[in-house]
Amino acid sequence: MAWVHEHIGAFGGNGSDVTVFGESAGGNSVLNHLAQKASFPLYRRAVIESGAYDSGAATLADAEAQFASVQWLAKCQHGGSADPDGLACLRKLGPDALRDVAVSQGALLPKDRGWGPVVDGVALPQAPLDLIRAGAYNKAAPVVAGTNRDEMSYFLIAFGVDTQLDEAGLEATLPVFGLTANATDLAALKRLFAIDGSGGYAYPPRAQRGDKYSDWWWVAQRMLTDGVPALGACSNRRLARLLLQGGTPAVFNYLFAHPTQSAAFPGFPGLGPGSVTVPHASEIAYVFGGAYLLAAGEEAALAAPVSAYWLNFARGANPNGPGLPQWPRYTDAAGAGGEGDVVLRLDVGSGGIAAQRNLRQKACDYMDRRTVAPKDAGKLAAMM
């Protein structure tokens, strides 16, 4: 970000008018910038696509342990007085050797911990959402944030989860992807996410879902989408509410809801002709205006307004513009406008782009109760 701020003028940009945006891990990085004080002067607006993670970040001790395992695998842990930290030894390794070390080291990591942001007490004094909860973040930056309808379907497909899951298969699958529940909790989740909608949770109609995936598969991917504190609508709602409470000048939430039919993404889990899911990363081609990558007709036409929203926000902190359906600012259920938790639903067809209120409300209310509030949040504000 510092490099961009300093050098973007050479590319025709304005270093004092930067919008930072990213998707997935890139969205995580943008969230980090919102909480990282050194970044505050380097951008004016932020876009977080499928990146509102609320699962903490590695501690310095975690990172040091990971580095020690790399040293051990690379046989670089004893550098002697000339190389006490083993860095010179590591720098001599070729790319193939480094790759082999990384692959081997990955097998040693806990399932919930990879290479990522570190709470080092300097750049990040606490996990980003803990800082935002405490009001210790960049309150001057307007934010666009959102998710895809079926985020975790990508991972279930990519990792080969049985497409015809039964109830027992669901129970076995949830903890593999980070959603643990006792018997009482699991029973409550099953009621909330019932495929027949009796718990207040909406699925595509049976005629649209088809029979490629079983009912329990749909329930599993939606429980994970909204229950794992990283990607889905509930994490995104949690972030939006915190930003609103913290005083962010404008928050715009979206839900991308179109199953992409284009054949331009062979091998991408959940995309392609006949697709019925809207997996992780579905929105990217539309954000970049990639109509040529999309199926002709309504799908390709959706790219123009989606891209326009992003460009308008980057230019003036407001995604709205001539000819576009109105994208309301986010307000929570008690907001002055009384709009409820409003998102802009992005889909094809007449009325496909429209404000939607109280998205997955009962499920997200329950997921919020499952999330333990951080201790001593008030102390974090003093760090800023």
PLM region descriptions:
Residues 1-88, 104, 109, 118, ...:
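Serine-hydrolase-like catalytic core of hydrolytic proteins
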Residues 3, 66-72, 89, 188, ...:
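Amphipathic alpha-helical segments that form well-ordered structural scaffolds
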Residues 24, 86-102, 189-190, 307:
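Short, well-structured alpha-helical segments that form the helix of a local strand-helix-strand
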Residues 81-93, 254-258:
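Acidic carboxylate-rich catalytic motifs and surrounding loops in phosphoryl-/glycosyl-chemistry enzymes
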Residues 90, 95-104, 109-115, 362-384:
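Catalytic-loop region of hydrolases
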Residues 97-300:
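Substrate-gating cap/lid region and adjacent catalytic-acid/histidine neighborhood
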Residues 224-225, 231-384:
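Mobile gating loops/cap/lid regions near enzyme active sites that modulate substrate access
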